[in-house]
A protein has these predicted regions:
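Helical "substrate-binding/catalytic lid" subdomain
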Residues: 1-102
Length: 102
């Protein structure tokens, strides 16, 4: 659960950073290579899990949020990550859990 929260947060940050770079006219592969060689380098950027439809992302974030509520722990980034993941899915035409029947 902790690993997945951090993974989806990295994927969300990668998506937003690469999207901004694209709008600035930066070549995506050159940007990715530069980021991998910087403090922004991370496993998700290297292995590109964002190229799959991320079927478990929202479920994972719902679990984290529920457990955090139960434990009375504030995890505000988790809610933001859940929304960014939805944005990525919408932008790429990937189904949400509801659309998949889950």
């Amino acid at each position: 659960m902790v690993n997945n929260l951090i993974l989806w947060a990295c994927i969300s940050a990668n998506h937003e950073g690469l999207m901004l770079g694209d709008k600035l006219g930066v070549d995506q592969e050159r940007l990715r290579a530069a980021l991998l060689d910087s403090s922004a380098g991370n496993w998700a950027l290297k292995t590109r899990p964002e190229e799959s439809p991320m079927p478990w992302a929202e479920k994972d974030m719902r679990i984290v949020l529920a457990e955090a509520d139960h434990l009375r722990v504030s995890v505000p980034l988790c809610g933001v990550v859940k929304e960014v993941v939805k944005t990525v899915k919408f932008a790429r035409g990937w189904p949400t859990p509801e659309e998949r029947g889950g």
